[in-house]
Curated annotation (Swiss-Prot):
The gene is lite-1. Keywords: Cell membrane, Chromophore, G-protein coupled receptor, Membrane, Photoreceptor protein, Receptor, Sensory transduction, Transducer, Transmembrane, Transmembrane helix. Changing residue 401 to H: In xu7; loss of phototaxis behavior. Loss of phototransduction in ASJ neurons. Slightly reduces lifespan under constant white light exposure as compared to wild-type. This is High-energy light unresponsive protein 1. In contrast to other members of the family, adopts a reversed membrane topology. It comes from Caenorhabditis elegans. It comes from the Eukaryota. The keyword Nucleus does not apply. One of its GO terms (cellular component) is dendrite.
Length: 439
């Protein structure tokens, strides 16, 4: 007969295993319930519900609600008015001394805290513009993307769907925590608990209510930017999956025999329809995100320059201020990566699609040299080549990898200009001080 301790160990191990299985089944059941009970709501992919729940809580988007109540619409308008008010107020505070007077241009560039104030204002402006995009994101205009989703999601397993749901949940929570960290850092810097360089010197007219208002606006702005970047990444992923599926149809890995001309024409026709759906989905993404791509680069470039300038020009800087500047830089890098990499990948997948169109005739129809097939294939290849799948930023520049070189050169150029201005300013101040001492 085994000792009592062995019975106890067996009981505890069995109990732990049962609890783990119960929790895992409960989690799967909850995810399955969420994914299955919201089919009628107007969003592209059901796994995006965590992002849309975050937007619903922030009052930035109500696409997951079947009927928008008056209370939620009032809440959304209040959030938008708050973002507009705090953004204008923050820009008005740029270059303002604690006593309310304004700095001149030389004093502004010589003061790192004025630069950080400008960075705060740029973040709030980005959040305001992102919220405008999120208010209109959804409903019927996403229909081309939803059509592509139906084709790409039919081959996705339930396990892959749950995994993507958990990834989006993590991204939503991480975005909220990152935005909360920035808002809390800003508030504590204003009250002088931890940091000081993150905010401007406390203005005489600034109250606790104003600080809380700015902190909440900064939280909503940062969360809106992150959510919009995540949605852009997910929508671009729909296009990329559809492109890969079309390439596999055009150039299959295994083919026993060459099709007859009638079958070849039908296959080309089906591929043309699939490509047109992909192009329509790309047009929807460009309609929603073209201006977003433009101002994300227009905001992140000066933020990088100002933060580098602050780090180089600050005479004495403590570890907490270094951490705060690093947080700002990480935020800017994440935003740029989430907006840049998906667009680069779509451009490269589009180039592979052009190459596959040439291979389609030579490898798939190499035995039947039918003139009708050749003319139809030529038209299809011309269609792909003339309507390239490349996203643009308000038609000012196209999103490919060459833009990274322009980005780095712009950051370096503006940083060197600021640094040269700071060196000349310090030399002039030193000359004035020497002249005063000698006189």
């Amino acid at each position: 007969m085994p000792p009592p301790s062995s019975h106890s160990n067996i009981f505890h191990s069995t109990f732990k295993h049962t609890v783990k299985e119960t929790m895992a089944n409960a989690k799967k059941t909850m995810i399955a319930k969420i994914l299955s009970s919201r089919n009628k709501w107007a969003i592209c992919d059901r796994t995006l519900y965590p992002i849309y729940y975050l937007l619903l809580i922030l009052g930035l988007n109500q696409s997951i609600r079947p009927n928008n109540s008056l209370l939620f619409r009032i809440y959304s308008w209040l959030v938008f008015c708050l973002l507009l008010f705090t953004t204008l107020r923050k820009f008005n505070q740029v270059g303002v001394r604690p006593n309310g007077t304004r700095e001149n241009l030389q004093e502004f560039f010589a003061n790192p805290r004025s630069m950080i104030t400008l960075c705060n204002a740029l973040i709030m402006l980005s959040g305001l513009l992102a919220s405008l995009q999120l208010y209109t994101l959804g409903a019927k205009r996403l229909k081309p993307l939803k059509i592509l989703c139906q084709f790409s999601l039919n081959v996705r397993t339930k396990q892959a769907e749950r995994r993507q749901f958990m990834i989006n949940t993590f991204l939503a929570v991480f975005s909220g925590l990152l935005a909360l960290t920035m808002a809390a850092t800003y508030a504590m810097s204003k009250w002088g608990y931890i940091l000081y360089i993150v905010g401007t010197p406390n203005l005489d007219t600034e109250t606790i209510f104003c600080v809380l208002l700015d902190s909440y606006a900064l939280f909503v702005s940062r969360a809106a930017i992150s959510a919009l970047a995540i949605l852009f990444y997910q929508h671009c992923s729909v296009i990329r999956r559809s492109i890969k599926h079309l390439i596999n149809e055009m150039v299959p890995a295994e083919q026993d025999e060459c099709p007859l001309p009638e079958s070849s024409l039908q296959k080309i026709h089906d591929c043309q329809i699939s490509y047109q759906r992909i192009f329509n989905g790309k047009a929807v993404i460009e309609e929603y995100y073209s201006f977003v791509l433009f101002y994300s680069y227009g905001v992140c470039i000066p933020i990088f320059c100002f933060l580098m300038f602050v780090g180089m020009s600050a005479q004495s800087i403590c570890w907490s201020e270094v951490v705060s500047i690093v947080i700002w830089i990480v935020n800017a890098i994440l935003v740029l990566l989430l907006f840049s990499l998906p667009a680069f990948m779509i451009n490269e997948d589009g180039d592979r699609l052009v190459a596959s169109s040439f291979r389609m005739y030579h490898e798939t129809f190499h035995e039947e040299r039918d003139l009708t097939v050749l003319s139809q294939m030529t038209f299809f290849t011309f269609q792909i080549h003339s309507t390239k799948l490349t996203l643009s930023a308000c038609n000012y520049f196209y999103m490919d990898r060459s833009i990274l070189l322009s980005l780095f050169s712009a950051i370096l150029t503006y940083f060197l200009i600021l640094w040269e201005f700071d060196i000349k300013n310090n030399q002039s101040l030193q000359n004035i001080a020497n002249h005063t001492i000698h006189t």
